[in-house]
Each structure stands twice: as C-alpha cells, then as structure tokens.
Amino acid sequence: MTYTEIKERKEKRYYYRVKSIRKGEKIEKQRVYLGANLNKQQLRDLEKKADEKLTGKIEEKSAKEKVIEKQEKTGKKTTFGISKEKNFSEWYTEIVKKAELGDLRYNVKGFLVFQPWSVMAMEKMYDYLEEVLQKKGHSPYWFPTVIPEENFMKEASHVKGFSPDVFWLKEIGGEKLALRPTSETAFYQMFALWIRSYKDLPFKTYQRANVFRYETKATRPFLRSREFYWIEAHCAHATQEDAMKQVHEDMETTKEVLHDIYGLPFIFFERPSWDKFPGAYRTFAADVLNPDGKVVQQPSTHFLNENFAKAFNVKFKDKDEKEKYCHITCYGPAISRIFASVIAVHGDDKGLRFPWKIAPIQVIIVPITNETLIINEAKKIKDELQENRISCKIDDSEARPGEKFYFWEMKGVPLRIELGKKEIQEKKLTIYRRDTDNKEKIPRGKLLEFIETASKEINKNLIKQADSLFKNKIIDTGTKQELKEIIDAGKIARCGFCSTEKDGEKCAEIVEKEINAEVRGTKLEKEKPQGKTSRCIICNKPAKHVVYIAKSY
C-alpha cells in the first residue's frame, strides 16, 4: 500500500510518500521525503518519482538530502547553498538572517537590530579607520545627537538638501530639535568658538556616531536604513590648497582601509554638479559595485570651501592679524554601509567570507568528538591563539562535525581547525581555509607560523578576486543602445558626456529615465575623450568629459 503522509510543523506542511510492506506479523514502512508547502502539480510530479523508488529497494538518503530534510523540519539551515550570481537579492536577504547579522523584526519600519556577528566585525572596522585618522592628526569628539533648527537654517542649500530626510523631535521648551542626519551644522557652530588663529589650523576632528535619515526608498539591512553607523571627519584649513590636500588625504585613507584591509575595490569619482553634497563646492565619492550590477556609494569627501565658514562665522587671524574665513572639508565613511559591501563583495554560494583583520572570529576550533582528551587539547590551542591576539572559539556543541563545518563556513570564519584522535596521535592539525575552500594538514608545532602566513594570504586572495571581478565589469561604449545593454548586464559603462556642470543635467535626466541608471561622475585623473568616448552618449555633442554610468542603490 502506497500513500502520501502530511505532517504540520510551525505553520508548514511536510509531505512524505510512504509504502507499507507486511513482513510476517510486522509492517515495515519505507518513506521518501517530498518537500514542504507543495502545490498540487508539484505534489503529483514528486509522488510519481517517489513511487518509482518505492517499487524497488529504497536507497539510503544522501548526506545532502538529509541536511535539506533537517533544514525543512527545523527551519534552520546548516549549509547555505544559494547562488549569489543568479539571485543576489535572495542571497543577501537570507545570509543576513541565517548568519544572524541583523534582525528586521523590530517594530519600527526601516530600523535594524544589529546582532553580535555584525557588531563584532563593525567594531574592528571602526578601530582600523579611527587608528588611521588619529595617525593623520584627527582628534576624536562626541557631539550631541540632537541639532537645533536654527543651526540647520544657517546654510540654505544644506537645509534644502536634507530637510525631507530629517527626523524632527517635538518642540522641547519651545525649541525644535532634529536627530542628526549629518553633523556639519553641529561641528561648525563649535568651530566658530574654538578657532581663533592660523596656529589652530589645520583643525582636524572626527566622531563615530549613529545618524538618522528618513529614507523613502526601500530599505535593506546595512545597505539603506533610517539609522546607520558611521564616522564623520570635519576639518578647517587656512587655504583652498590645504583643504584640497585634505580631500586627497581622505581618498588615501579610503584606499588604506577600505581596499587594503576590508578588501573592497572601488573607483573615486568627482560627482557632477547636480549630484554634489548639499552645500559643497566639490564632492568626491567612492563607488563599490555589488554583484547585482548596482553601485553603492561608500566614503565621500567634500570640499565645502568657505560656504559653511561664512554661514557659521568660522574665522581665523593670519600671520598679519588679518581675519579670514576657514576653508572646510568633511569626510564620511558609513561603517554599516561598508559592512554591506563586505558581505556582498566577498560572500559566495556557501555564505560569508571575511577578510582576516575584520572577521568576528578568526579561527574556529571543531573537536570531532567531545571526549575529554580532545576538548583539553582544543582548550590548549585556544589559549595559545588568544595569547597571540588571534580571536578564536571552540565549537563543542552537540551538533555533528559536518553540521559544524557547514555552519562556520556560512558564518565566514577564515580558518577552521579540525581536531580528532588521529590529529592528536599524529601531532598534526587539519586546517580548512574559507577563502580557498581547501584543507591541509600541518604539524601541531607549526600552527602559529601557519596562521601568520595564511592570514596575509587570505587578504591578498580576497582582494585579488574582488579586484579582478570589478575590473572586468567596466565597459567602453559610444551608443545609447550599447549603453542600455551594458547597464542591463549589470556592468559600469564608460562613455563620453557633454558636461558635468548644470548644462549637462538634462542629458543626465535622460540617462535616468531611459536607461534607468545614473551618471556617477569623472575619475580624478582626467581622461581625454577619444574613440568611443569622443561624443556625448546622449546628445552627440563633442564630449568634454569621460564619465561612468551605472545603476545605484
């Protein structure tokens, strides 16, 4: 007798094809798992296939089938297995959940609960950036979260640019206060009190902070939300030349940290005049390309010239006792958004992959069994690693070794040490590298030496892979049709453009409406329009600039 059995768990229906066979006085049942929440057609098709199996001897389920069935029953995946290339949106959403990076179930729309695995990584990201900023002369400050309305009103273009995004608190004591969307109007209010002489310059500050913006676009965890975590640096200078040197220093900082430590490839663009930071004279921003073909704006640095200095009366006396306005710059690396790029750029179909220096845990130690001998050796290894400032953990849970392997691979831990009786007897360790997906055995006494070498190789390898993918995504074009094809293929188009000043904005609007993309800007090293880039991609006038066009978040 063959029939379909249905079991309900946690609002899901699980289907099994069952064959009952009488053997003497006993009845044996053979089962084939069909799946969960199937429609009628799916059920019929799977029943037919199952019946073919049940007519003969049922083979033992493969390890993969067992894992999948267990995942369906428990709702908890021990392995990941979603194609990042084919379905990046699903991949990203699921890895945030399964790797326990953030929880969206907080009951205010657009706000995310940051979970330990993401916080541990972002704390390290903060530390590296702050270390570089302090080495370059920036002093840390903590400013209030609220900014009075009168501060906002002092710089007209800044007010116009940010007003729609501001969270306003109810009037307190007759004063209207905003939750900071950014802190120019807070810092420069104080700069006017602190700066007196040319001897005070350059005046270089920064703070780590959370900021609030009422995003009207669809929010995505870490990528776009109504509260995010960042560093903002604000500096005052005596001359334009000094201010522009600071802008270039900010770009160097971005390369030193984002590329060389976090492993993210990017291009710094000067934004066109219609896309500048509100109140800025010039805006420069780093764009990182996600696997879905959209660019993410990462750190931006802005030359504000004297605009804010005049609005807030930020002045200094030069050597001749003449009073002058300061030239101000600001720089904003959004840590939570950069973390989104780390997830997207380095992850693969198995889950996360972390660069060594920012991994929440750098080494996971997996005892093959929880016997005292093995656990004691695992503890010795853990102590040795921690003494050498390597973050590590022992997974002595009751899960099977295979499940532990899958789980920590999904979490992106760079190195795994597998420890069983055989390893102890041979005085060797089995090491798995997440970046290469390879295992090797090493002598127990060579562990620290191995990790020192591997940690450098892991970063180099991830950077090399990311750089290669990014480089191959930039395509030259000279026609609108070709431009559309490049953008639809998830790549960045390099093309000629008539102007990046206000007279080019109409062509940029056509790019948005017809191509569903944006003019991201020009490279810092000015490129000469020639060949395919010699004429404007939209109006066909002689091109003044070579620009880059892409979809964005």
Report each predicted region and the residues it spans.
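Conserved glycine(s) in the ABC-transporter nucleotide-binding domain "signature"
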Residues: 1-70
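NTP/phosphate- and nucleic-acid-binding module
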Residues: 69-553
